[in-house]
Amino acid sequence: MATTIRCARATDVPDVLALWRESGAEPTHTDDAESLLRLIRHDPEALVVAEVDDHVVGSVIAAWDGWRGSVYRLVVSPGHRREGLGRRLVEAAETRLVDAGALRLQAIVVETDPRATGFWRATGWEQQVGRLRFVTG
């Protein structure tokens, strides 16, 4: 099984959304085709996927706003976990963002998900204590 890490295409959007649902990722109101297609149009390199045998089995959003790099939606299919795909997706996101000029990267992680927080700690990223995230919409 050859694994490819690449930028997502518009045709990947249904598979990415299905991956998010099947993996148990915490849903948000922007988990829809229109939002992902808008992301790809705005920044064609932001959504990165892992593909095995022509099937999307992982994703990460590596968002660059010109100031700071943000990593969202790191998801790996349950059937492909513990194969190093999460780490490869994070490395692809880091490379994309650092190459774009980001000096600081941040990851948005569900605090109550021990699998996710454990993964991020294992990658060497540090939890920033004392900060809260405020959102609207």
Tell where the protein language model's regions lie, with residue ranges.
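A short, internal acetyl-CoA/4′-phosphopantetheine-binding micro-motif in the GNAT/acyltransferase core
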Residues: 74-81, 109
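Conserved beta-strand-loop-alpha-helix junction that forms the acyl-donor binding cleft
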Residues: 107-116, 135-137
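Conserved GNAT acetyl-CoA-binding A-motif
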Residues: 97-110
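Conserved acetyl-CoA-binding loop-helix of GNAT-fold acetyltransferases
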Residues: 82-95, 122
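A short beta-loop-alpha structural element at the N-terminal edge
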Residues: 2-16
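Conserved acetyl-CoA-binding loop of GNAT-fold acetyltransferases
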Residues: 121-130
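Conserved beta-strand in the GNAT
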Residues: 49, 55-63, 70-75
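A short helix-loop-beta-strand connector motif used in the catalytic cores of GNAT acetyltransferases and
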Residues: 37-49, 70
